[in-house]
């Protein structure tokens, strides 16, 4: 698989490309599947439809990898926190984590309840071309913890940060509990058939450097170290969004570092490129315009050349991006990097 070879810095015929949120609302096929499911959460839980949605971007765009269609919040959901997705607002937990007792009340072994995810993986792997990789994923302990403490997405993360500074033992207990679940969750995804795993630390930038390293990065390192110990042949991709200023403190046992669009690729290459393959980092809104897209691709390839790089966006696809431009991006990257 070209994608897997690239993760391990092996020679590939061209630079592989996939896109975060490549299965999404910009595809009418996705909208049809979502309509059939009835709700976003039901789409995640319906393995037949989730498989359909996982495969759509591979078939339509020609990307080199599929990423499992699911949501990072299925883990806290199965730990016992009731979750709903409110239209135009997003995820909302009906209960939140407020103290040590609420952490202790969370169910252990949530990963055993996620068979709908593992079924999606095995169905997708059966239908996906042998040349294409399937990526599994989860959210980072810190990012999941913020949702569980705030109850929803937040601009300030005030409750989470208040807990971090005034009751760090409560936050640590939650992060520890989540880490153990996530190690087993990703292990079962691998056993079900994914070829690589990615951990999204979407709210990494909410913390100052010292707090980030202690309350987020340390847990990511723990998870990736255990996964590499168990499955050395499976690439681990880490994507901590918005921590470009902390790159000099990044270390650990993983294979690919995801670079967001706000982090200069030159800096990431200089600091991390010798140790890790880099993934990224086209600004997603460049896909609105072909000239802007071409300019962005040119700039990235000038920095990265055609080694030690997986092409991706620096954040997720937006719902109204023109699909033909997404398709063009894949063709352009393949053509410009062909050896």
UniProtKB/Swiss-Prot annotation:
Q: Where are the transmembrane segments?
A: none
Tell me the gene name.
hemE
What is the name listed in the Swiss-Prot or TrEMBL entry for this protein?
Answer: Uroporphyrinogen decarboxylase
Assembly and binders = Homodimer.
Note the superkingdom of the native organism: Bacteria
Q: What does this protein do?
A: Catalyzes the decarboxylation of four acetate groups of uroporphyrinogen-III to yield coproporphyrinogen-III.
Q: Which Pfam families match?
A: URO-D
Provenance organism: Helicobacter pylori (strain HPAG1)
Family matches, as SUPFAM superfamilies: UROD/MetE-like
According to its UniProt record, which reaction does this protein catalyse? uroporphyrinogen III + 4 H(+) = coproporphyrinogen III + 4 CO2
UniProt cross-references to InterPro entries, sorted A to Z: UROD/MetE-like_sf, Uroporphyrinogen_deCO2ase_HemE, Uroporphyrinogen_deCOase
As for subcellular location, the record says: Cytoplasm
Q: Where does substrate bind?
A: 21-25, 71, 147, 202, 315
